[in-house]
Amino acid sequence: QEGDYQPEIKVFELCEEIACLYTQPADWQELCRRFGIGDKLKNAVKSLSGGERQRLFIVLALIPNPELVFLDELTTGLDAKARRDVWRILSKLKEDGLTIFLTSHFMDEVEALCDEICVLRKGMAVFYGTVEQAKAQSGCEKFEDAYLRLSGEEDAA
């Protein structure tokens, strides 16, 4: 969730370094623009806000043009508008064929982005299916309530 890069490396330098490792990288400048950091290319990574760094890390994950991307707590540190913008972009990438493996503690994010979910309890999978199936199996109307019940966190809440 936090990158460790050369202290003074600039956004464009980091993106170029990643892109040069791949034969057909994505257009990282376009990705930066889409993720709202296109005007930060000459800034040092360390000077970016937490939300800007988080969006940069998503861009870095997408530069290789993957068919599958793993995103861990991808919107941590983002404000509500930035979260929605990231969701919109990722939804479009998903429509274009990108498979997203997402870990999140934000159930609204899971509901918005995930076709299938896996709920864990003490490191063990206790549910696999859709959000609607989770609500039906748990007897809850809201997905967050279903998650809490299935994960065993309901009593702790």
What are the roles of these predicted feature ranges?
Residues 69-72:
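Catalytic Walker B motif of ABC-type/P-loop ATPase nucleotide-binding domains
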